[in-house]
Amino acid sequence: RGVAAVQKGSEGTEQAVQVTTIQANGTMKITTEKQLPGWYQTSQNLSASQQQTAQELVAVLSDSSDISTDLRKAFETHRLLQVKIVAARCLMQLGEFNPIMDTLNNAEYRSTWEDSVTAISKCMTPGEMNMEQITEALQSRAGDQTEVITEMLGTCTDEQLQGDLGAAMVQGLGSTVMLERVISFIRLKNLTGKTQMYFPDKNPHQQVASIRRWQQLWTDKKLQRQAAVINVSSLIP
């Protein structure tokens, strides 16, 4: 959270900006800068709806030092879905993944699923504390499938896609657990660029034909990463 205010000096003096920043741990600092901070500049490029969402979220934040408590309350009780999802993603950045995982088990959030799965995947850095927290959040929702779903969220080569990992993603499309269907489908979609007219929020028994098309792609070794994914992967050391 932060507020930036411009303080104009007397004529002939250089304009200065006083920046007040409240950090997640509750500490506050006031600095004088020559220009507005990067986070403020970014906030000016938000759409009208994004600005409204941000204002709604800030309105429910208290002056307490525990911002996580405020964000949890916003996620659990706010009337606007967009505010709830932003609160969940803020908590994710603070290392709390339970709220964002809950959204993947709720069809009301279907419009946010792709961005959320992508955001979680970006947190999958081996050796980081996030890995343990993601695994713990998945464990209570996916049970025995936790390990394979965690693998789905990581990087994936063509060989893995055409091997056991790809098979697990396709199998996940038929899961009774919505979260597993959501992650399996969105990872397949993002990697291959295909959908096969599959919808993770629908009962898998109603999507037999779509699932069979995915199964056939895997059997024929035609599950391949689209060019955009390969180009991005080549930039990662």
Name what the model sees in each region:
Residues 7, 26, 31, 138-139:
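Long, low-hydrophobicity ectodomains and other hydrophilic envelope-associated domains
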Residues 21-48, 75, 95:
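Regulatory inter-domain linker segments that are low-complexity and enriched
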Residues 43-55, 80-82, 99-237:
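Long, helix-rich interaction regions
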Residues 9-25:
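Tight coil/turn sites that cap or link beta-strands
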Residues 60-65, 127:
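Helix-turn-helix repeat elements of alpha-solenoid scaffolds
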Residues 1-10:
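Glycine- and acidic-residue-biased ligand/ion/polar-headgroup-sensing regions
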Residues 67-86:
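Alpha-solenoid helical-repeat scaffolds
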